[in-house]
Design a protein with these regions (language model features):
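Conserved small-residue
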Residues: 1-480
Length: 480
């Protein structure tokens, strides 16, 4: 979620982009399995991104009309750019158009004012009505006969892995998608130079020489942390009609035992990858396989990355109960509660070396006032505070929450606590930092027997996701 203030500076009016990551069938269509194409369409259109206009009127934030407000879903026309655009791995015999985005998790914001939404667990929306090609790539990305039991493949052939006319439809998902919040007619663009994997988020910063840098986590146990560096100054590239997100290099991280690290080049110019892949389009479509071949460090579920004002990069590693052998960067085996790692790149984010350290272990907070588990969302403010959101089973009798850490002292304080079985996710602020937007996702996991939130208790209504507006009573900076 990101707030785009009107004229780049308004504290009371702007566009809010919000991801709709997933909705279970029982929650959205009222039954465990779809029984028709209409059921599938309803489920599909509950996924995607909303772009809404907000205004603070008399102290109350509310939606207002705007020609740029829109809903982007699984059947919205999209386009591809970068090295994979026009590649054979995106072609289907059905010659169907490029459509949709799904399982949109976290996000990023470009310096030119566009929204980057990240496709995460896209594999779960595919299934098979018959035999299908169980390729190495499909196995690595987690495709299966039933997926996550959405059942779309039963009524929509695009998501049927056994339908040969749509053999490459699965390759059309797993990308970072760029959306212009101030142009309702813009076609969302899948930026393929950033790789294809289970994108959690896209932390954007500007490095040496004005080059654009994007840090990204692949949200699965034993997967990797990536960064993308544009080939030139981002302003210069845009002035020449080039997208900084289309031209540059992708890297994957290797964390060494001595507290140093290396960014390994994920390009076809790398001899290791030239021996395994036909071209750069294939390297990027199968980014996970490329990173495997390079010997990147398997991490404990890399989720949000964020760049602090001092240049340090933080990344949440949510948990990994399946880890049996610890290493320096993932030193708890099993890692049931997660940790946060930080690093500092050389050459102002554009180099290939870095130094790293563990910022904190969630397990170490248990039994204290600072207790939390399963760190997920991250946002650093300019004053050295790190806002941390959680998405798993909390210890010490708590629900999911948002805590604030002092990055200098390590002190933690709780700012927000959610309802049962929800996830605290998304964070956006107005330019003056006196208004903070956050979300609760899938309260009660969509089960009205657990909670009716935000409806009054006992009303019988299905629980709904909610965006909260947080301000201080004294009008000060939130979190201070």
């Amino acid at each position: 979620m990101t707030f785009f203030p009107e004229n780049g500076k308004s504290n009371s009016k702007g566009m809010l982009c919000v991801n709709h990551e997933f909705g279970r069938n029982t929650h959205v269509i009222g039954k465990p399995d779809p029984e028709s194409k209409d059921d599938v369409r309803l489920s599909q259109h509950a996924h995607g991104v909303s772009v809404v206009a907000l205004e603070n009127k008399g102290g109350t934030w509310q939606t207002v009309d705007s020609p740029n407000a829109r809903r982007i879903h699984v059947n919205t026309p999209v386009t591809f750019s970068g090295p994979v655009a026009g590649h054979r791995l995106l072609e289907n015999k059905a010659r169907n158009p490029f459509l949709g985005t799904v399982n949109n998790c976290s996000d990023g914001e470009t310096p030119w004012g566009t929204y980057l939404t990240c496709e995460e667990n896209f594999n779960g929306y595919f299934g098979a009505t018959g035999d299908y090609a169980r390729t190495e790539a499909r196995e690595r990305y987690g495709f299966s006969e039933n997926g996550f039991f959405y059942g779309w493949h039963k009524f929509d052939p695009r998501f049927d892995l056994s339908n040969g006319d749509y053999a490459n439809e699965d390759n059309r998902f797993g990308w970072v998608v760029e959306i212009d919040p101030n142009d309702g007619g813009q076609v969302p663009v899948k930026r393929t130079a950033l790789g294809r994997f289970k994108h959690e988020g896209a932390a954007v910063t500007v490095g040496r020489g004005g080059r654009l840098v994007v840090y990204m986590g692949d949200d699965q146990t034993f997967d990797y942390i990536y960064k993308f560096v544009s080939e030139d100054n981002w302003k210069s590239m845009r002035a020449r009609g080039l997208s900084p997100l289309d031209h540059g290099k992708l890297y994957v991280a290797r964390f060494n035992e001595n507290g140093t690290g290396d960014w390994l080049e994920v390009t076809h110019d790398n001899p290791v990858l030239a021996a395994k892949f036909k071209d750069q389009g294939e390297v990027l479509t199968y980014t996970r396989l490329a990173a495997d071949a390079l010997g990147a460090t398997p991490m404990d579920r890399p989720e949000w990355a964020t760049v602090a004002p001092n240049g340090e990069v933080y990344c949440t590693l949510t948990n990994n109960s399946g880890r049996e052998v610890a290493d320096a960067a993932n030193p708890r085996a099993p890692n049931r509660d997660g940790h946060i790692i930080k690093w500092l790149d050389n050459d102002q984010h554009t180099g290939t070396r870095f130094v790293w350290d563990i910022f904190l272990f969630a397990e170490d907070t248990h039994g204290t006032e600072e207790t939390f588990s399963d760190p997920d969302g991250l946002w650093p403010d300019p004053d050295g505070r790190l806002f941390i959101q959680t998405d798993g089973g909390q210890k010490d009798g708590l629900n999911n929450q948002m805590v604030v850490a002092d990055t200098r002292t390590g002190e933690l304080r709780r700012l927000f606590t959610g309802v049962t079985s929800d996830e605290i996710t998304g964070i956006a602020v107005t330019p003056d930092r006196r208004t903070l937007f956050i979300n609760t996702q899938h309260p009660g996991n969509g089960d009205p027997m657990r909670t009716n939130f935000p409806a009054p208790h006992g009303s019988g209504k299905v629980p709904r996701d909610t965006t909260f507006v947080i301000t201080r009573k004294d009008g000060g900076i939130v979190g201070s």
